């Protein structure tokens, strides 16, 4: 049985500016919410740095961030409490694979989390059902899993040296996304839509700084299952990281102004029809 990946909030936040930009782009496509004040759920909230942005857009909202990682929730506590606009921000433990709302929400949103949840598209009907009339379901997932950073990770996990320890999916088990057309098809089947689902993709051409920045990036996300699997063997962990680092250096050579790291992301926004 695979151990659940452990998370390091500080490592994840090392590239917070690049990781946060897609959420701003997602928020820009969300219409005003029906509730006064609105009730909002953030699925897979991580350390809370993105969740707090919801209170900037809707200052009087009651926002709850849900995550399955105790370490991430502990980091998120620094944002918890009453908000300047008269709303409230709190956090709770929940696994997105099983979370079913116990109340009505005006917005259910998820940023860069559902790729870890196998079959997450099957959860859409239950989440949508718990939207208020005029409410919105919106999410963003990485769509970068065929890029060198992720493909090389999977290939290395399946190499003879690592296959017995890592070849059962530790390097690839997070690839649970659909292509944009797949999300459009699933969301279009939801009842009572206000309009056609808004689904799109964007490739962010990022310039990362520092030594081996792509390796540093993946340590916060894609490498987490591998690092968890090798946590009790520091020598093996170091050897794996050295091999992966060398592959990444060839795939993403450093330039005079940094390392170019393109990253594709997939977005979707769907709105329920308001009561007439």
Model regions and ranges:
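Conserved Class I S-adenosyl-L-methionine
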Residues: 47-49, 173-189, 193-276
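Conserved alpha-helix/loop element of class I SAM-dependent methyltransferases that forms part
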Residues: 17-38, 53
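Class I SAM-dependent methyltransferase SAM/SAH-binding core
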Residues: 39-99
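Conserved catalytic/acceptor-binding region of the Class I
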Residues: 121, 128, 136-209, 233
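A short SAM/SAH-binding and catalytic strip from SAM-dependent methyltransferases
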Residues: 107-120, 143
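A short acidic, Gly/Pro-enriched loop at the edge of an enzyme's catalytic core
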Residues: 97-108
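Helix-to-beta-strand junctions that scaffold the AdoMet/dcAdoMet cofactor pocket
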Residues: 117-118, 131-133
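Class I SAM-dependent methyltransferase Rossmann-like catalytic core
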Residues: 3-20
């Amino acid at each position: 049985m695979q151990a659940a990946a452990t998370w390091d909030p500080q490592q994840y936040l090392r590239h917070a500016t690049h990781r946060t930009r897609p959420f701003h782009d997602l928020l820009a496509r969300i219409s005003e919410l029906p509730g006064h004040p609105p009730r909002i759920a953030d699925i897979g909230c991580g350390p809370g740095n993105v969740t707090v942005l919801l209170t900037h857009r809707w200052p009087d909202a009651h926002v709850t961030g849900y995550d399955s990682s105790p370490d991430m929730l502990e980091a998120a506590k620094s944002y918890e409490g009453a908000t300047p606009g008269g709303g409230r921000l709190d956090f709770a433990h929940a696994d997105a694979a099983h979370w079913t709302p116990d109340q009505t929400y005006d917005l259910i949103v998820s940023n860069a989390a559902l790729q870890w949840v196998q079959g997450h598209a099957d959860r859409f009907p239950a989440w949508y059902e718990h939207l208020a009339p005029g409410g919105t379901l919106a999410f963003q997932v990485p769509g970068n899993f065929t890029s060198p950073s992720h493909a090389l990770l999977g290939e290395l996990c399946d190499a003879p040296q690592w296959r017995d320890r890592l070849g059962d999916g530790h390097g690839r088990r997070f690839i649970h996304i659909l292509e944009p057309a797949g999300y459009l098809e699933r969301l279009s089947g939801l009842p009572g839509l206000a309009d056609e689902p808004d689904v799109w993709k964007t490739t962010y051409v990022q310039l990362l700084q520092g030594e081996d920045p792509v390796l540093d990036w993946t340590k916060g996300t894609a490498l987490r299952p591998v690092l968890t699997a090798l946590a009790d063997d520091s020598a093996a962990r170091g050897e794996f990281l050295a091999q992966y680092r060398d592959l990444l250096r060839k795939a993403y050579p450093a330039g005079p102004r940094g390392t170019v790291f393109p990253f594709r992301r997939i977005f979707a926004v769907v709105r329920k029809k308001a009561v007439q």
